[in-house]
C-alpha cells in the first residue's frame, strides 16, 4: 500500500480513530460508483425490455442473482483475492499489468499478451469513466420526476449543469471539499440501509432471495432470457474495479473492512427493500429506488442522491487522471501537462486533456441517451470487459508470482473466468442496443495507446541504426581531443551504450565539449516507487565522461534536477548555474519501411509533435536547456 496508508495502518493498533478515518475515507473514494448502482439497477431489470415479470418469482430470482453476484464478484474475487495482488501497494489495471508483465518476463509471448491485455483494460476503463458520471447523475436527477409532475423536460438540462460544473472545478482541485466525501457517503449508505429496512419490514419474504435456489430457479423458468438478465444485474457490480484501482490511497484492510461492515449490508438491504416495494406494487418497478422512500423523504433523497452521484463521478474522474499518469510513466500515452492541485496530497492531480475529453464524452452521452434507462443499455460492456481483463491478468499472477499449486489455482481461475465470461457474453448484445459508444471509445483509445507504444519502439530502433558505440567515441576523443569548456553538459538518451545524437550534433556544430559530459538515461520501472538507494547508478569512463541512470516508479514525478541533487559524487558537479541540459527533439517522417501501417505512422507523428517535451516532463530549468532537432524516418 502507499506510504501514507502504511504509516496510518501501522499506528492504528493504538488509535482506533485512525482505522475509522481510513474506512470513512475509503467509503468516500472507493465506493461511490457501486454505491449509487441501486438508483438504476432494478429499474433496468424490470423495465429494460428483458421480459421479466414483476411478480413473486421474478423479484426473488433477480434479487438472488444480485445478492450472489455481489458475494462472488465483489466480496470473494475483488475484496478477498484481487486486493492482495498489489504492486507495492498500488492497484488498478495498469499496476496489475505491470506486475503481471514482470511475472511473465521469461515468456515472451505471455508478456506480449499481458501488455495487450493491460492496454485493452485501460482503454475500457476510459469508456467506463464517461458512462459512470452520465448515468449516475441522470438517475439521481430523475427523482424529481417522481416528486413533481411536468419536470421530465428539465432532467437533461439539470444533469448537464451538474456535470459540466463538476468538470469545470477540476482545475482548481477538490482537496477542500474532498474531506466531506467520506461523511456524505457514510450518510448515503446509512440512508440506503434505512430505506431497505423500511421496505423489508413490509415484505420480509424477500429475505428468501439469499437462498441461491431462487437464482437457479429463475434461470430454469426463464431459459430464453436468463443469461440476458445478467447484462442488467451486472449494473449492481459497476465500480468493483474502483476498489482495486484506489487501493494505493487507503490500503487493503480499510477497503475490505468498509465493504463488509457498511457497504455490502447497506446495498443488500436496499436492493431487498426495493424488491419488497415491487412485490407490494408492481407499478413501482418504473423507479423502485425513489418509490421505496416515504413521501416526506423523497426530496431529501433526491438531494442526497445528487451529492452521492457527484462524489462517485469525482472518484471516476480522479481515477482517470491517476491511470493516465501511470500510463505516461509506463510509456503507453504521450506526455501531457500534469498539474498538482494540492500541496499536501500527491495524488491530487489535474490533466487538462483528459478532463476535457471526458467532459465532451459525458455531455454527448447525456444528450444522446437522455435518460438513465436508455443509458443503461450502453453500460456493462466496458465494466465486464475490464473485469474479464483483470481475471486474465490475475491468472498470470496466481501462476507465476503466487505460485499456487495447480490443484488450487486452476479451478479457482477457471471459476473466475467462467463467471466473468458469462457476464461479458450477456453484455455483448448491448453493442447493437446502444453499447457501441464505450466499445468505440475503447477501440480509439487502444489504437492511440498501442500506436504510441509501438511508435516509440520504432523511433528508438531507427535512432540506434546510426548510433556510435560509446567506447569508440571516447577513444576517438582521446586521439583528437576537442576544446573543453567549463561546466557540466547533461545529454538525455534512451540508450545506455551509445552516443546521444544531441552530443554528436553539438560536437559537429560547436566543436567543443564541456569539462564534464554526463550521458543520462531515465528508466521507468514497473513498480510504483523506487527506493532512494536504487534511484541512480553512476559509471565513470574517464576523461570527464560519466554515465548516470535514474530510476523512477510509475507513481513518481520524474524530477531530474531533484534526483541529481541526491547524486553525491566528488568528481561530479551538478551546480544549477554550471549545468546545461542538451535534448534531442525528433521529427518523425512516415516511410514505406517495415514497421507500422502508414496511417499509424502519420498518427504517431501527430502525437509526437503535440506531446509535452522532455523539458517540462523532467522539470528541467528553462534557461539551462538546449534542444537540437533531428529528422527520423520510421
Swiss-Prot record:
One of its GO terms (molecular function) is symporter activity. Pfam families: K_trans, K_trans_C. Keywords: Cell inner membrane, Cell membrane, Ion transport, Membrane, Potassium, Potassium transport, Symport, Transmembrane, Transmembrane helix, Transport. It is found in: Cell inner membrane. The chain crosses the membrane at residues 19-39, 62-82, 113-133, 150-170, 177-197, 225-245, 259-279, 291-311, 349-369, 379-399, 406-426, 431-451. GO terms for cellular component: plasma membrane. It comes from the Bacteria. It is a multi-pass membrane protein. It catalyses: K(+)(in) + H(+)(in) = K(+)(out) + H(+)(out). Transport of potassium into the cell. Likely operates as a K(+):H(+) symporter. Belongs to the HAK/KUP transporter (TC 2.A.72) family. This is Probable potassium transport system protein Kup. The lineage of its organism: Bacteria, Pseudomonadati, Pseudomonadota, Gammaproteobacteria, Pseudomonadales. The gene is kup.
Amino acid at each position: 500500500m502507499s506510504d501514507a496508508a502504511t504509516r496510518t495502518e501501522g499506528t492504528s493498533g493504538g488509535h482506533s480513530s485512525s482505522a475509522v478515518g481510513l474506512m470513512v475515507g475509503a467509503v468516500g473514494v472507493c465506493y461511490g460508483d457501486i454505491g449509487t448502482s441501486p438508483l438504476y439497477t432494478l429499474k433496468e431489470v424490470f423495465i429494460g425490455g428483458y421480459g421479466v415479470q414483476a411478480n413473486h418469482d421474478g423479484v426473488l430470482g433477480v434479487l438472488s442473482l444480485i445478492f450472489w453476484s455481489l458475494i462472488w464478484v465483489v466480496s470473494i474475487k475483488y475484496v478477498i483475492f484481487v486486493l492482495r495482488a498489489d504492486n507495492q501497494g498500488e492497484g488498478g489495471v495498469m499496476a496489475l499489468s505491470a506486475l503481471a508483465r514482470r511475472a511473465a518476463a521469461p515468456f515472451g509471448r505471455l508478456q506480449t499478451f499481458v501488455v495487450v491485455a493491460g492496454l485493452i483494460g485501460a482503454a475500457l476503463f476510459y469508456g467506463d469513466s464517461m458512462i459512470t458520471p452520465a448515468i449516475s447523475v441522470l438517475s439521481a436527477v430523475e427523482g424529481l420526476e417522481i416528486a413533481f409532475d411536468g419536470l421530465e423536460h428539465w432532467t437533461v438540462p439539470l444533469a448537464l449543469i451538474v456535470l459540466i460544473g463538476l468538470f469545470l472545478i477540476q482545475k482548481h482541485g477538490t482537496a477542500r471539499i474532498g474531506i466531506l466525501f467520506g461523511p456524505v457517503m457514510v450518510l448515503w449508505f446509512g440512508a440506503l440501509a434505512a430505506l431497505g429496512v423500511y421496505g423489508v419490514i413490509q415484505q420480509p419474504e424477500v429475505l428468501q432471495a439469499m437462498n441461491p435456489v431462487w437464482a437457479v430457479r429463475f434461470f430454469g423458468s426463464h431459459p430464453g432470457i436468463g443469461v440476458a438478465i445478467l447484462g442488467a444485474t451486472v449494473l449492481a457490480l459497476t465500480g468493483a474495479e474502483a476498489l482495486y484501482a484506489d487501493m494505493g490511497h487507503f490500503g487493503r484492510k480499510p477497503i475490505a473492512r468498509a465493504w463488509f461492515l457498511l457497504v455490502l449490508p447497506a446495498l443488500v438491504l436496499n436492493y431487498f427493500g426495493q424488491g419488497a416495494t415491487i412485490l407490494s406494487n408492481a407499478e413501482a418497478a418504473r423507479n423502485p429506488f425513489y418509490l421505496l422512500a416515504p413521501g416526506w423523504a423523497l426530496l431529501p433523497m433526491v438531494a442526497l442522491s445528487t451529492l452521492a452521484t457527484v462524489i462517485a463521478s469525482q472518484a471516476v474522474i480522479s481515477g482517470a487522471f491517476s491511470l493516465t499518469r501511470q500510463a505516461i510513466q509506463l510509456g503507453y500515452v504521450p506526455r501531457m501537462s500534469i498539474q498538482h492541485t494540492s500541496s499536501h496530497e500527491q495524488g491530487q492531480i489535474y490533466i487538462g486533456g483528459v478532463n476535457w475529453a471526458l467532459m465532451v464524452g459525458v455531455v454527448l452521452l447525456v444528450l444522446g441517451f437522455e435518460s438513465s434507462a436508455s443509458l443503461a443499455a450502453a453500460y456493462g460492456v466496458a465494466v465486464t470487459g475490464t473485469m474479464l481483463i483483470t481475471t486474465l491478468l490475475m491468472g498470470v499472477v496466481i501462476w507465476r508470482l503466487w505460485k499456487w499449486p495447480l490443484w488450487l489455482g486452476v479451478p479457482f481461475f477457471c471459476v473466475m473466468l467462467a463467471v466473468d465470461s458469462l457476464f461479458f457474453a450477456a453484455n455483448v448484445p448491448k453493442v447493437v442496443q446502444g453499447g457501441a459508444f464505450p466499445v468505440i471509445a475503447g477501440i480509439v483509445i487502444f489504437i492511440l495507446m498501442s500506436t504510441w507504444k509501438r511508435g516509440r519502439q520504432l523511433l528508438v530502433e531507427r535512432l540506434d541504426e546510426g548510433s556510435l558505440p560509446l567506447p569508440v567515441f571516447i577513444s576517438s576523443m582521446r586521439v583528437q581531443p576537442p576544446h573543453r569548456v567549463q561546466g557540466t553538459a547533461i545529454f538525455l538518451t534512451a540508450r545506455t551504450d551509445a552516443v546521444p545524437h544531441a552530443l554528436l550534433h553539438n560536437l559537429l556544430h560547436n566543436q567543443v565539449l564541456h569539462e564534464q559530459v554526463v550521458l543520462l538515461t531515465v528508466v521507468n520501472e514497473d513498480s510504483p516507487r523506487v527506493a532512494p538507494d536504487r534511484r541512480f547508478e553512476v559509471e565513470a569512463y574517464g576523461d570527464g565522461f560519466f554515465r548516470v541512470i535514474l530510476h523512477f516508479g510509475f507513481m513518481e514525478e520524474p524530477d531530474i534536477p531533484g534526483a541529481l541533487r541526491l547524486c553525491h559524487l566528488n568528481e561530479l558537479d551538478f551546480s544549477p548555474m554550471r549545468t546545461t541540459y542538451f535534448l534531442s527533439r525528433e521529427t518523425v517522417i512516415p516511410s514505406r519501411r517495415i514497421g507500422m501501417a502508414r496511417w499509424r505512422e502519420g498518427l504517431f507523428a501527430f502525437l509526437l509533435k503535440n506531446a509535452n517535451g522532455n523539458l517540462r516532463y523532467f522539470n528541467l530549468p528553462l534557461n539551462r536547456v538546449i534542444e537540437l532537432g533531428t529528422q527520423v524516418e520510421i
